[in-house]
């Protein structure tokens, strides 16, 4: 049995804890608020500010974990190097977590060091620099904070008149006090995918069937598997994913995102060194092993005999229309649970914000079925659940 310190206790962490419990592991779930989803299924829990390096060190010394598994990005990530030097396994590695937290570090690694195809980009430390970069890149363009998550601070800028708002919005959405943004060429893509990639301690890099997804404001709204893409494009994406994960080092599951263009091919977008929100579709039984089980096996060094597509699947999120500190209630469960070949997952978040992700609907069908129809079904059913 390993003692695992989980940093971040959202819905992805909750599913990881469930997988870990089924393998007899001991989990300490941490977050900045009490009653977070993963805490509800963990052995122990801690509530503290994970951006506070001293507090993070205190918790690590208190529990002396064998493994630290970051589940979110709002962590004092540079401290992970120290824990790794002390002999604690950081997942997938301290290097990976630090690089992927910073869009500057990961983009320069991908584009300049590894030669992966990406959108053209510049950095801006002031509004003037942002205006200069936009003039070079042209409109529309995408502006993002160097450090943020779930689309925070991200905007699509269609004209010079919108740049001042994009600058303020980006800085306000940035982690900490960093006032530097990345401005990117807008790629006219036909689709975007997540390629769940598994790096192992003792074994080859493995890939899950590609997952298509739709985002709004940089945040996941629906996903489906398998995404139908050109085999040559899939091979190109797999090669890029293997290159970047090998450079970042470590064992675990990664969510590697790509833009696909029929005209211009495959563009590397970004990656997360952990299970991915779009990968929740694997909870519909689309694969023999879902993304959380794969992450756990890679972390523990357990064998993964292979990844097989068992059936097709689609997911659609359930969002809160309200903000309240009261525990949320849900209408429509009877209707949803009466649907065939459908799972409902309520995450158990103790309070709501407007557009906060509160649950997900998962639909499945045999291989070869109509995937577009399944996507429509998942969205239709998700709309039946009312958060109040």
Swiss-Prot record:
One Pfam family per UniProt: ATP-grasp
Residues the entry annotates as binding ATP: 103, 144, 149-154, 184-187, 192
Catalytic activity entry: N(1)-(5-phospho-beta-D-ribosyl)glycinamide + formate + ATP = N(2)-formyl-N(1)-(5-phospho-beta-D-ribosyl)glycinamide + ADP + phosphate + H(+)
Enzyme Commission identifier(s): 6.3.1.21
PROSITE patterns per record: ATP_GRASP
Binding site for Mg(2+): 257, 270
Pathway note: Purine metabolism; IMP biosynthesis via de novo pathway; N(2)-formyl-N(1)-(5-phospho-D-ribosyl)glycinamide from N(1)-(5-phospho-D-ribosyl)glycinamide (formate route): step 1/1
Tree of life domain: Bacteria
Ranges for domain ATP-grasp: 108-300
GO molecular function: ATP binding; magnesium ion binding; phosphoribosylglycinamide formyltransferase 2 activity; phosphoribosylglycinamide formyltransferase activity
Main EC class the enzyme belongs to: ligase
Membership in a protein family: Belongs to the PurK/PurT family.
Xref: HAMAP family: PurT (MF_01643)
Subunit structure, as described in the record: Homodimer.
Described purpose of this protein according to its UniProt entry: Involved in the de novo purine biosynthesis. Catalyzes the transfer of formate to 5-phospho-ribosyl-glycinamide (GAR), producing 5-phospho-ribosyl-N-formylglycinamide (FGAR). Formate is provided by PurU via hydrolysis of 10-formyl-tetrahydrofolate.
Protein name, as recorded: Formate-dependent phosphoribosylglycinamide formyltransferase
The organism's taxonomic lineage, starting at the top: Bacteria, Pseudomonadati, Bacteroidota, Bacteroidia, Bacteroidales
Gene that produces this protein: purT
């Amino acid at each position: 049995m390993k003692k695992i310190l989980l940093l971040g206790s959202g819905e992805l962490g909750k599913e990881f804890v469930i997988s870990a419990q089924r393998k007899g592991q001991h989990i300490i779930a941490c977050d900045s608020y009490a009653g977070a989803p993963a805490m509800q299924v963990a052995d122990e829990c801690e509530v503290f500010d994970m951006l506070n390096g001293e507090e993070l060190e205190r918790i690590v010394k208190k529990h002396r974990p064998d493994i630290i598994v970051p589940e979110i990005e709002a962590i004092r990530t540079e401290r992970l190097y120290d824990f790794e030097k002390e002999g604690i396994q950081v997942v997938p590695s301290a290097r990976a977590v630090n690089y992927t937290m910073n869009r500057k570090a990961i983009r320069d690694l991908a584009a300049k060091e590894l030669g992966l195809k990406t959108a053209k980009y510049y950095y801006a430390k002031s509004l003037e620099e942002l205006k200069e970069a936009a003039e070079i890149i042209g409109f529309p363009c995408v502006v993002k904070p160097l450090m943020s998550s779930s689309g925070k601070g991200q905007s699509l800028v269609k004209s010079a008149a919108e740049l001042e708002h994009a600058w303020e919005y980006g800085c306000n959405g940035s982690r900490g006090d960093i006032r530097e943004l990345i401005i990117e060429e807008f790629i006219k893509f036909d689709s975007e995918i997540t390629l769940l990639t598994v790096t192992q301690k003792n074994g080859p890099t493995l890939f899950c069937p590609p997952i298509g997804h739709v985002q709004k404001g940089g945040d996941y709204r629906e996903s489906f598997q398998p995404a139908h893409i050109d085999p040559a494009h899939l091979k190109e994406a797999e090669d890029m994913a293997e290159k970047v994960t090998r450079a970042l080092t470590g064992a675990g599951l990664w969510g590697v995102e790509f833009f696909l263009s029929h005209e211009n091919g495959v563009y590397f977008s970004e990656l997360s060194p952990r299970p991915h929100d779009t990968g929740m579709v694997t909870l519909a039984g689309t694969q023999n092993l879902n993304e959380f089980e794969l992450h756990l096996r890679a972390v523990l060094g357990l064998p993964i005999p292979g990844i097989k597509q068992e059936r097709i699947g689609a997911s659609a999120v359930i969002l809160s229309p309200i903000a309240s500190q009261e525990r949320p209630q849900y209408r429509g469960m009877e209707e949803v649970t009466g649907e065939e070949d459908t799972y409902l997952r309520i995450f158990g978040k103790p309070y709501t914000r407007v557009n906060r992700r509160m649950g997900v609907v998962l639909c499945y069908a045999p291989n070869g079925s109509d995937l577009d129809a399944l996507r429509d079904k998942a969205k239709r059913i998700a709309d039946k659940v009312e958060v109040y």
